Amino acid sequence: MNFTIILAGLAIILFFIYFFYTGTTRSSYLLFVVMFLPLMDLGVTPAAFGGLSVFDAISFVTAFLCYKDILHVSRKNNAYLYLFLLFVTFIFLGSLSSEFVSKSLFNILNIIPPFIFIRLLLKELEANDYFLKKFLLYLKIACFVAIGFIVVQMVVGLNFTFYSSLNQNVTDGGKNRYPGFFGDSQMSGVFLAMMSFLFLLNLENPKRPAIKNYIFFGIAMLAIILAGSRSALLGFGAGLIMLVIFVGGNFRVTAMVFGVLIGAVLLYFSDSFVLFQRFSTLDDSIDFRASIWEGAYDIFKKNFAFGIGINNYQDYAKLHSQDQFLLVDNDEILFLDAPENGYLKFLTEFGFFGFVTLFLLILSPVINVFYQFIMGKKVSLAFYFIAPIVCWFLSFTSLYTLSDSRIIIPLCSCIAFIIAYPLNLLVKHEE
């Protein structure tokens, strides 16, 4: 039996034990998700039945047992609920109009667990003033586990993994790009880049992180480089620049000095890191992606309103866009399941209306925080949660990351945290 199947089954069993032992509460579900984050993307159903992960399965179980928390929505969050229902409606219409109706309808199940997670996290933040610190602690521990995996892989090799085979991108020019507990080094890089900003977070004084915050941040930065992901590093840089601009205070000066010192050291040893060597091939990578993007955009134009149906890109490419492929080992043709760009993936599969609705859901809370900042309110803490979203947003241009629950979970967590700001749940930490 496949090792990942055993791990997935074990994770489900552990969830039921923990969940019922602690009283079937929403906090039990939320803490289990982050405590066992490395296992959350392991599959529990085949692709033909939605390809559900451990995260999906335990989210549906929790929604059934905690249905009152799901159904009761405060008026302040009604707009997000209506946007989500509108998004699901557009995806449903796209599935019905696609060439792969049954597959698309099953895959709609994949978009519901993130909503369940955010909904329950918002409820818990509202009810429990101490939950934020505990939840953030477990997220940071998950990041340390990812870093620990990389350290072990540096010592014993890439065979230290959950997976029977890894993505071919884990080696480049004979050098390793370390995937941690992911099967793909680029996914690992984006995860580490997003999570690194949480190490800078000092709830007691957002504008003055402690020395330990900078040390942990530096360790995470080194792990990003070992993962060898250009998109992750660029997203990391964008998030850091945003923090320097908007957080201000002593953080601005300290972060700039810290960044210059770390950058100088890394550049001095750049020949030792595969990431920096990969920038020399950036032009070739862009040329390849541009040809893929052009084909994907043509697919979008032909299916403008509702798209080709969720998770249908690979099947559609096989029939109608046969230039969307890679040559892998032994010159085997592998049709792409995403066009090397997350935004084009969503445009082609969700269509214009689904795409716009989804990004309204993601960006509305972010825009609201910037509005509060302009109005003179104290929202420094919120920018530490926006930075991972900015990081993800930029990396999404060259890497479709939302196929992995371990990226979805921190992204949804940050969205929930900044939605909480209008509810005045976290603003007290600014005072």
Identify the role of each PLM range:
Residues 61-65, 385-431:
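Transmembrane alpha-helices of multi-pass inner-membrane enzymes
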Residues 148, 152-157, 227, 244-284, ...:
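A membrane-periplasm/extracellular boundary helix in multi-pass inner-membrane enzymes
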Residues 89-92, 113, 133-165, 173, ...:
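Alpha-helical transmembrane segments of multi-pass inner-membrane proteins
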Residues 1-6, 43-54, 101-109, 182-190, ...:
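Helix-loop-helix junctions and helix-breaking kinks within/between transmembrane helices
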Residues 280-294, 298, 306-350:
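Long extracytoplasmic/lumenal interhelical loops at the membrane interface
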Residues 54-56, 79-89, 100-123, 137-138, ...:
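Aromatic-anchored transmembrane helix interface
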Residues 1-68, 92-97, 392-394:
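N-terminal signal-anchor transmembrane segment
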Residues 203, 208-213, 237-241, 245, ...:
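Hydrophobic transmembrane alpha-helices and their immediate junctions
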